[in-house]
Amino acid sequence: MTPELTFSRLAGGTRSAQLLVVGPSLGTAVTGLWGECAALLDGRFEVVGWDLPGHGNSLAATGPFTVPTLAAVVRDRAVALAAGRPAAYAGVSLGGTLAFEFADDPGPFTAAVSIASAPRLGEPRAWRERAALVRRAGTPVMVTSSAERWFAPGFTDRSPAVASALLTALSKTDRRSYAWACEALADLDPSNAVRPTAVPLLVVAGAQDVVVPPEVAEVGARSYAGVSCRVLPGCGHLPPAEDPAATAAILDGALIDEDAA
C-alpha cells in the first residue's frame, strides 16, 4: 500500500534558494532528530522533513509498505515542494536507505546524502523478530535497547533533553507502523553490482555507531562507483541530533548549488 506521510517545514521558506528534504531513522520523529541541524542550515535551504508512518506527525499505516514505496512518495512530494528550485535529500538509517533509491532514480533531487545507513541494514530474520516483538509488546519495549544503540557513549549525560525527547517519540510510535517499517527493512534486496549514480551521492557514518559501523557504511558506499564515505567523530547512530553543527557542515559542503546560491 502507499502510506500517507506528513511533511513539516523545519527551517527556511519558499524563498530559500534550495530545497533540502530530510528523512528520519526508525522510531524517531523528524523534528526531534533534525530540528537543531535544520536551524543551522536556515538561510541556505528550505529544510522540509517527513515522518515515517505512525511516527511523529504521520498517520499510522493501515497496511505494509516498502522502502521503494516510501521513496516514491517522497520523490513525488519533492517535485511540488521544489517548485523548480534545486532539491537535495538527506536521510538517517531507514531514511538513509532512500538516498540509495534516489541515487538510482533521483526524480527532482540533484544530490543525496545517506547518514548512518547502507543499501541493506541488518539481517532480515532479526528485523522480522523485532517486528513480532513490537506488535506484541508495543514500542516502549524498544526504549532501553535503543538508548544503548542510538547514541555515542556519554551523549545522554551531555544532552539529556535531546536524548529524552527522541526516546519519548519512540515510545509514542504506533506499534503496527513500526513493525511494518521493520519488515520493509527486512525486504530490502539491493543489487550486488557496482554501478554509477544518477546524481552525486555521499555516505556519512558515525565513528561510534554500533548499528551501522563505519566499515558497514563504507561497504555500502563502494556499491556505487566513485562514492566516498565521511566519518563523523564522536557520533553514534543519530548524527543530526548528536552533532548538529558537524552534520550541517557536511551537508553545506556536499549540497550547496553554486548556481542557486
Where in this protein do the model-derived segments appear?
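Conserved HGGG/HGGXW glycine-rich cap/lid loop of the alpha/beta-hydrolase fold
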Residues: 2-60
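Gly/Ala-rich beta-loop-alpha elbow adjacent to hydrolase catalytic centers
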Residues: 91-95, 99
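Flexible "cap/lid" loop of the alpha/beta hydrolase fold
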Residues: 100-143
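Conserved alpha/beta-hydrolase catalytic His-Asp/Glu region
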Residues: 122-125, 137-196
